[in-house]
Amino acid sequence: MLTAEEKAAVTAFWGKVKVDEVGGEALGRLLVVYPWTQRFFEHFGDLSTADAVMHNAKVKEHGKRVLDAFSEGLKHLDDLKGAFAKLSELHCDKLHVDPENFRLLGNVLVVVLARHFGKEFTPELQADYQKVVTGVANALAHRYH
C-alpha cells in the first residue's frame, strides 16, 4: 500500500496535526456536506444548520475520538484491518453504519488537512494520505464483507 518513504512522510506530518481541531472540523464537515450521515448522531443535539453542527461540542468531541483512533491506526499501517477490527465490528454489528461513510469521512479529512496546512500539504502528501484514508475505510468496512 505505502512505501517506507510514504509511511515516514505520513507519520512525520501527523505529528503536526491538532487532532481535536481537525477531528471536530472533519466530522462537522461530513455532517454538513453529507447531511444523511446525521442520522447516526441525532443524540448530539442541534444539527439543524451548518453553524450549529460546526459549533456542536459533541461533534467536536466525537471528531477528536475518531482522529484518536486514526492516530492509533497510523502506528499499524501494515495491518490496518487488525488495527480497526474492533471498530469495524462495532460500526457494522451494533451501529449499522453504511461503510460508504468511512470513505466520505476520509475524503473530508484530506480536505481539512489541506485547509489547515495549505502549501505544506503538498500534492505528494495528499496522495499519501489518500492511500491511508482509503486503507482505513477498507479496514473499517472489512466486517461488512
From Swiss-Prot:
The modification Phosphothreonine is found at residue 11. The modification N6-acetyllysine is found at residues 58, 81. Red blood cells. It holds the Pfam family Globin. GO terms for cellular component: blood microparticle; haptoglobin-hemoglobin complex; hemoglobin complex. InterPro entries: Globin, Globin-like_sf, Globin/Proto, Hemoglobin_b, Hemoglobin_oxygen_transport. The modification S-nitrosocysteine is found at residue 92. Heme b binds at residues 62, 91. One of its GO terms (molecular function) is hemoglobin alpha binding. It comes from the Eukaryota. Residues 1-145 form the Globin domain. Keywords: Acetylation, Heme, Iron, Metal-binding, Oxygen transport, Phosphoprotein, S-nitrosylation, Transport. GO terms for biological process: hydrogen peroxide catabolic process. Involved in oxygen transport from the lung to the various peripheral tissues. Heterotetramer of two alpha chains and two beta chains. Belongs to the globin family. This is Hemoglobin subunit beta.
